[in-house]
């Protein structure tokens, strides 16, 4: 929930030469690997057949899937699930043009962003699987790489608010030259002109583990208003929460199951003997992160107050380090918050809450979560976000539409939070509306007068204290 108030006063290389090199036995060189969960073998077979059908029936030249998984601590990329990118509805029409059947980069990245909002911390859109003939893949490769670049950029924005560089720059493509089901993998450096390097794809039994905590905060920040620029809800919220997000990623104090652990330690020390499915975490932030060295009188012309109490359910590969586990928790918190802010901001084009006539305060209630587990990996909890009039059936439909999860109602949990009642919304406003707000007039010196009166009162109290002290001392 956020609320903002106006007009209040506050204080405040290597060379390509042929040579022999002696290998240091203590030095190991590892390469990143693309690992698909073994359960995805069935998906590959099914998807290849499905593409052959739509190719012959509708003439659709390619099928694309978003690969959901994790950037593992050892550099490998683990894939847990694949979600189909739909084609535009016009591609299914009887006389559809060839151009309408193509998956454009903007169309794909828009759908990837919707997926990102649903994923827990530690799980990302790590790449794209592509089913087509070889020529189509070659012709569309630049568009695929462009899409991956957009996805990485969006992931940075929604998961770290662009204040931390912890999102990997490497993403993957996995090409299936149908009807073959043999994967051809490549790792793409999206920050280096999309350069790619071939990489073998392997199927293994993969496992993730849950990281659980709760996070609540009250963030108060005055967002400076630029003259001539209308205030923007989303941009203002990014500015208002920037210090908090910075502090979150700089935080070094975390307990995992009640222990302080070294960042470089493996999260699970003995995987073969491990029986844990969940690890509880506690993060400790610097409470003075929003304090400045000097205090000056200022006028808060665009004050924002952000309140949240969020249940965190992140997930990481079981072979992760402590550092990456803690990072996933932070990613979850930021992504969960900003996913709601983005959805709310988009909905404001339809519904805009009226500003309080008394104080100019607007209260924004962000959508609440509904969740379901990824059936192949129960540690991965998928999120949907519901508005006040939405219900569990809406969440079930969204899970099916976006990820083809086909989840039953019984497996959708919307009990994490609830919408505030009208009475509770009024109670949120009340503490602020009880204050006396006065429009600031730059030509007026009333605030200076108030300051002078306070100084005078302080001097009088000081004099009285001195008189009493000397009277008692000499009596």
UniProtKB/Swiss-Prot annotation:
Alphabetized UniProt keyword annotations: Cell projection, Chemotaxis, Cytoplasmic vesicle, Endoplasmic reticulum, Golgi apparatus, Membrane, Olfaction, Sensory transduction, Transmembrane, Transmembrane helix
GO CC aspect terms: axon; dendrite; endoplasmic reticulum membrane; Golgi membrane; intracellular membrane-bounded organelle; protein-containing complex; transport vesicle membrane
Mode of membrane association: Multi-pass membrane protein
Localisation: Endoplasmic reticulum membrane; Golgi apparatus membrane; Cytoplasmic vesicle, Secretory vesicle membrane; Cell projection, Dendrite
Entry-linked InterPro entries: ODR-4-like (IPR029454)
Protein family according to the UniProt entry: Belongs to the ODR-4 family.
Name listed for the protein in its UniProt record: Odorant response abnormal protein 4
Underlying gene: odr-4
């Amino acid at each position: 929930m956020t609320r903002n108030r106006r007009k209040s006063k506050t204080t405040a290389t290597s060379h390509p030469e042929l040579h022999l090199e002696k290998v240091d036995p203590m030095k190991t060189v590892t390469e990143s690997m693309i690992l698909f969960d073994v359960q995805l073998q069935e998906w590959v077979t099914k998807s290849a057949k499905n593409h052959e059908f739509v190719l012959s029936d509708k003439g659709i030249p390619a099928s694309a899937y978003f690969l959901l998984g994790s950037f593992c601590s050892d550099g490998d990329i683990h894939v847990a699930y694949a979600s189909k990118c739909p084609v535009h509805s016009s591609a299914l029409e009887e006389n559809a043009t060839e151009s309408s059947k193509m998956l454009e980069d903007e169309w794909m990245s828009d759908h990837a962003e919707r997926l990102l909002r649903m994923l827990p911390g530690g799980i990302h859109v790590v790449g794209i699987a592509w089913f087509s003939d070889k020529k189509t893949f070659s012709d569309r490769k630049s568009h695929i790489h462009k899409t991956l670049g957009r996805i990485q950029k969006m992931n940075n924005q929604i998961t770290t608010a662009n204040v931390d560089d912890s999102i990997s720059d490497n993403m993957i493509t996995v090409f299936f030259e149908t009807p073959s089901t043999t994967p051809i993998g490549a790792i793409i450096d999206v920050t280096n002109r999309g350069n790619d390097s071939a990489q073998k794809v392997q199927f293994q039994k993969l496992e993730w583990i849950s990281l659980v905590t709760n996070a609540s905060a009250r963030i108060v920040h005055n967002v400076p208003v630029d003259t001539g620029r209308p205030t923007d809800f989303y941009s203002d919220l990014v500015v208002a929460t920037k210090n908090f997000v910075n502090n979150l990623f700089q935080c070094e104090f975390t307990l995992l199951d009640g222990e302080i652990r070294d960042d470089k330690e493996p999260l699970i020390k003995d995987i073969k003997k491990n029986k844990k499915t969940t690890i509880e975490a506690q993060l400790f932030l610097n409470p003075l992160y929003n304090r400045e060295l000097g205090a000056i009188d200022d006028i808060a012309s665009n004050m924002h107050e952000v309140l949240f109490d969020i249940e965190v359910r992140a997930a990481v590969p079981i072979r992760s380090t402590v550092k990456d586990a803690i990072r996933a928790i932070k990613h979850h918190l930021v992504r969960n918050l900003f996913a709601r802010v983005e959805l709310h901001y988009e909905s404001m084009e339809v519904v805009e809450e009226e500003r309080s006539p008394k104080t100019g305060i607007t209260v924004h209630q962000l959508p609440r979560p509904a969740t379901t587990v990824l059936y192949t990996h129960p540690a991965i909890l998928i999120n949907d976000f519901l508005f006040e009039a939405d219900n569990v059936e809406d969440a079930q439909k969204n899970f099916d539409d976006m990820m083809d999860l086909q989840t039953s109602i019984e497996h959708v949990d919307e009990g994490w939070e609830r919408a505030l009642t009208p009475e509770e919304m009024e109670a949120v406003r009340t503490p602020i509306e009880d204050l006396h707000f006065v429009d600031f007039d730059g030509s007026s010196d009333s605030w200076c007068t108030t300051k002078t009166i306070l100084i005078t009162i302080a001097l009088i109290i000081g004099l009285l204290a001195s008189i009493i002290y000397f009277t008692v001392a000499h009596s």
